[in-house]
C-alpha cells in the first residue's frame, strides 16, 4: 500500500497544541497527489494544461486521535471501486506512531472536456 510521511508544520498547530482540524484534508491531498504521481505516473499539473481536471467530488473524514506538535504523520492511500463508473474512492488513513489519527474516503473523478472519466491505469487496479 502506498504511504507518504510528513512532519507536521508548526503553523498547523492550534492554541491547544494539536493540529487544527482544518489542516487534515491538506495532508490527505498532498499524499493523494503523490500517490497519483508515484504509483500511476499521473502528473496533475501537466494534465491540467491538457484540459484534464482531477477533482474531489465529496469526502468523508473521521477524526480518531489528535495530532500534536513535532509529530510525523504517515498517510496511506489506495483506490476502490465506486458505485458510479466515472468515479473512484480514494481511501486514506493518517497514522501517528502506528495509531490511526484520521481516516477519509475521497470520491474523485477526472473531468475531460467537461465529462467525468477515470483513466485506464486506475481502472486496471479496481
Language-model region placement:
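Hot-dog-fold acyl-thioester-processing enzymes
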Residues: 1-56, 109-126
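HotDog/MaoC-like acyl-thioester-processing domains
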Residues: 63-72, 80-126
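Intrinsic-disorder/low-complexity, polar/charged segments enriched in Ser/Thr/Lys/Arg/Asp/Glu/Gln
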Residues: 1-5, 23, 58, 72-74, ...
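Short hydrophobic interaction/assembly module
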Residues: 48-76
Amino acid at each position: 500500500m502506498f504511504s507518504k510521511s510528513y512532519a507536521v508544520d508548526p503553523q498547523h498547530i492550534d492554541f491547544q497544541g494539536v493540529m487544527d482540524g482544518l489542516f487534515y484534508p491538506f495532508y490527505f491531498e498532498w499524499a493523494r497527489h503523490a500517490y497519483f504521481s508515484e504509483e500511476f505516473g499521473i502528473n496533475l499539473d501537466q494534465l491540467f494544461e491538457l484540459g484534464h481536471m482531477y477533482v474531489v467530488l465529496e469526502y468523508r473524514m473521521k477524526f480518531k486521535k489528535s495530532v500534536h506538535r513535532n509529530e510525523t504523520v504517515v498517510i496511506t492511500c489506495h483506490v476502490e471501486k465506486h458505485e458510479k463508473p466515472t468515479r473512484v474512492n480514494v481511501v486514506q488513513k493518517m497514522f501517528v506512531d502506528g495509531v490511526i489519527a484520521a481516516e477519509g474516503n475521497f470520491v474523485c473523478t477526472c473531468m475531460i472536456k467537461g465529462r467525468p472519466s477515470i483513466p485506464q491505469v486506475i481502472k486496471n487496479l479496481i
